Amino acid sequence: MQNSHSGVNQLGGVFVNGRPLPDSTRQKIVELAHSGARPCDISRILQVSNGCVSKILGRYYETGSIRPRAIGGSKPRVATPEVVSKIAQYKRECPSIFAWEIRDRLLSEGVCTNDNIPSVSSINRVLRNLASEKQQMGADGMYDKLRMLNGQTGSWGTRPGWYPGTSVPGQPTQDGCQQQEGQGENTNSISSNGEDSDEAQMRLQLKRKLQRNRTSFTQEQIEALEKEFERTHYPDVFARERLAAKIDLPEARIQVWFSNRRAKWRREEKLRNQRRQASNTPSHIPISSSFSTSVYQPIPQPTTPVSSFTSGSMLGRTDTALTNTYSALPPMPSFTMANNLPMQPPVPSQTSSYSCMLPTSPSVNGRSYDTYTPPHMQTHMNSQPMGTSGTTSTGLISPGVSVPVQVPGSEPDMSQYWPRLQ
């Protein structure tokens, strides 16, 4: 690649980045177009992009020139000081005028021609520059103009005109009043000498400043808005207009209020969900329906051998329901009344039965006892064989017994205690 070029286009042609095509290439494009070549053929022959060929030919057919338009800073300035002053004058006369209306007035009044008329974007840029210059005015000038609009006089920091001046030693207070009157005449003359348009501009700026302040709602307005919010979180335009007419608020303010209120409601709903989840988490151990021994502490077994109380063996069942006890009772041993109760496998349906032994008939082989079960389990439990005992025996104490029973250590004395429980 040569040093004079900075790139190669998609057709293989060289070009200098940011600079227009040379005049020789432009002339060849026009000559080939006159000879009847299509733009796509010209693009392929001269290795120039199709867009570039179309742009040059379009400008040639429109203006008859093959010269490129001005680039960089070589473009003649159309926003001359005279044009800028006219634009500022039109804007002062009508602050709500549009840029295209200013452009039409410049043409109709002969300020500009079709050759040097600024574009709409140029006029908008001039208006932005004028607004920024006004905003960059000193604070003193801004406050002076605002006081002029409010009917006050004097410079910033001094007393308003309606306050009486303090008397200076050696000078009567009437001089101060005359001086204030003179200042009022000065300000009136300034405002009458071309400040009418500035007053309108300052009113517009003051209105914009006031629009940026937060809206203060009365209690009646808040109640009406909250009532409407309870009905729907997204009121339509008809509901907003009806509410605006009712509470004397702009419809846009009502729309913004509902947007802020919905955001507040979402925050509150999030907090409510968090509290609800925290309250739903179990803070205690769930009680099993089968009263397993892992929940309640079992009563410790007696240290005295069981053979000293009964001649039979301990109940050999491993069912969890039979070892079921309550920790609220005082420690008492559990005893069996059967000599040779046969070993039975645990039945799943017996897990809900209580381990209390109730006497059924004292005439059958001394005493015989059955386990107490719910009524719906009677048919199943009647088929279970129960062993009998030929000696004086004791029964298992149910968890519901709250009377402490003292069991003596000798077998002959036990008969005088157990009849009390029957």
From Swiss-Prot:
Give GO MF terms, alphabetically.
chromatin binding; chromatin DNA binding; co-SMAD binding; DNA binding; DNA-binding transcription activator activity, RNA polymerase II-specific; DNA-binding transcription factor activity; DNA-binding transcription factor activity, RNA polymerase II-specific; DNA-binding transcription repressor activity, RNA polymerase II-specific
Expression is induced as follows: Up-regulated in response to transient cerebral ischemia in cerebral cortex, striatum and subcortical white matter fibers in the ischemic region starting from 24 hours after initiating the ischemia.
Entry keyword annotation includes tRNA-binding: no
Q: Which residues bind DNA?
A: 4-130, 210-269
Which residue intervals are annotated with compositional bias (Polar residues) in the record? 185-194
PTM note: Ubiquitinated by TRIM11, leading to ubiquitination and proteasomal degradation.
Q: Where is this region: Disordered?
A: 157-201, 269-311
Taxonomically, the superkingdom here is Eukaryota
Q: Outline the segment boundaries, as ranges, of region: Required for suppression of NFATC1-mediated transcription.
A: 345-422
Q: Kindly list the GO CC terms recorded for this protein.
A: chromatin; cytoplasm; nucleus
The record names the disease as:
Defects in Pax6 are the cause of a condition known as small eye (Sey) which results in the complete lack of eyes and nasal primordia.
The name under which this protein is listed is Paired box protein Pax-6
Q: What is the lineage of its organism?
A: Eukaryota, Metazoa, Chordata, Craniata, Vertebrata
Query: Gene encoding this polypeptide?
Result: Pax6
